[in-house]
Swiss-Prot record:
SUPFAM superfamilies: P-loop containing nucleoside triphosphate hydrolases. GO terms for molecular function: ATP binding; ATP hydrolysis activity; peptidase activity; proteasome-activating activity. A double ring-shaped homohexamer of HslV is capped on each side by a ring-shaped HslU homohexamer. The assembly of the HslU/HslV complex is dependent on binding of ATP. CDD domains: RecA-like_HslU. Pfam families: AAA, AAA_2, ClpB_D2-small. This is ATP-dependent protease ATPase subunit HslU. GO terms for cellular component: HslUV protease complex. ATP binds at V18, G60, V61, G62, K63, T64, E65, D270, E335, R407. ATPase subunit of a proteasome-like degradation complex; this subunit has chaperone activity. The binding of ATP and its subsequent hydrolysis by HslU are essential for unfolding of protein substrates subsequently hydrolyzed by HslV. HslU recognizes the N-terminal part of its protein substrates and unfolds these before they are guided to HslV for hydrolysis. Belongs to the ClpX chaperone family. HslU subfamily. One of its GO terms (biological process) is protein unfolding. The keyword Chaperone applies. InterPro entries: AAA+_ATPase, ATP-dep_Clp_protease_ClpX, ATPase_AAA_core, Clp_ATPase_C, HslU, P-loop_NTPase. It comes from Desulfitobacterium hafniense (strain DSM 10664 / DCB-2).
Amino acid sequence: MEQLTPRETVRELDRYIVGQNQAKRAVAIALRNRYRRSLLPEGMQEEVLPKNILMIGPTGVGKTEIARRLAKLVRAPFLKVEATKFTEVGYVGRDVESIVRDLVEISLRMVKAEKMEEVEIQAAQAAEKRLEALLVPGKRQENNSSNPFQFLFNQGQEKEETVTPEIERDRTFIRERLHRGELDEQVIEVEVEDNQPLLPDFLGTGMEINTNLQDMMAGMLPKKRHKRKVTVREARRILTTEEAQKLIDHDEAVQEAIRRVEQEGMVFLDEIDKIAGRDGASGPDVSRGGVQRDILPIVEGSTINTKYGPVKTDHILFIAAGAFHVAKPSDLIPELQGRFPIRVELESLSIEDFQRILTEPQSSLIKQYSALLETEGIKVEFTENAIDELAKVAYEVNSNTENIGARRLHTIVERVLEELSFEASELPEDYTVTINREYIQHRLGNIVRNQDLSRYIL
């Protein structure tokens, strides 16, 4: 875990997210407390539990982005889920324990990627040797196996390879050509593992019992392989990945993945206000309280069985978020409310915020669109009054219709640049376009003035 101070964390988040200092401070403190906890004696570490955070604010103000950027910052296992996807145990749908199972899978992918980077040089060397053997195959001698069961798994005929001095000489010549990149575009045939499921998805996507059956069958039967025609460049990548997989210790990777989930895992529970049932609820609201009660043990700490082993959730940091337009945080069951002691209210965006969102972040909307059009040789320049006008229009449309926060800017900028994006490929090279207030008013004038139109178009 990176040892960032709360101030450094907020400064990093400022590069991507405008405003919302209270929310940034809350997550920065939660992150620093994790590092502080890691320095405590082992007995004390178990006692210090994370203080989960509840973010309250309208859509498009930065709730999800804060959590996502924070996880990237510390390279922690991070999972974003919508609370509305889950149903009470006994109903059709995903059960809440799949949160932990998915988090372990994400963590394992991260750990394996890191470990594969460590063995990249050895894997590349082994892949190069396999490439040479594919381009200059040795003499093969069939070795008929006496084991009848091997025929079931297409392994009845193992082939031994004999490398003669002539073949070795040819491979040396090919090796030099491979290093020079002369054969990168040549098409060859390679054997790759078949990633198709062994069983059809007869219970529906995401159903846990189906996933468990797939894993069980995968463990019983050997992996099927099939032949693919690819370029040497692509074959090198495929073979390097396969060789790296062989070099890493799978059990060690699993242990490290589980440790990271237990000690550094982060879960972002979005739309939590949608499962906050009102008193006397009926119909579709019936199972909402059940989902809350199912989430409760995971948030307060329990042991979940996964295919990689048991995972304790006591020290996973949960960040819940919701607009709470209809329901209130007090509509959540009291036990769940108590598990989110830190409440942060995110402010709605002002005109000044919109101006900053358009220009300040590292990958702001204006920079993105300018870079896209620059690929066609079109230089787009936005004047200051154009930025002011875009911010003003976004604020007005949000005020008069649904408030969707910063996402409104995507719709407006897309509308402003629609004609230019369409004609860009036909314009001459080094063409410069200046976007000013008049240009924006010309493109959006009638739509902004007519509320009925802006409801449907912006």
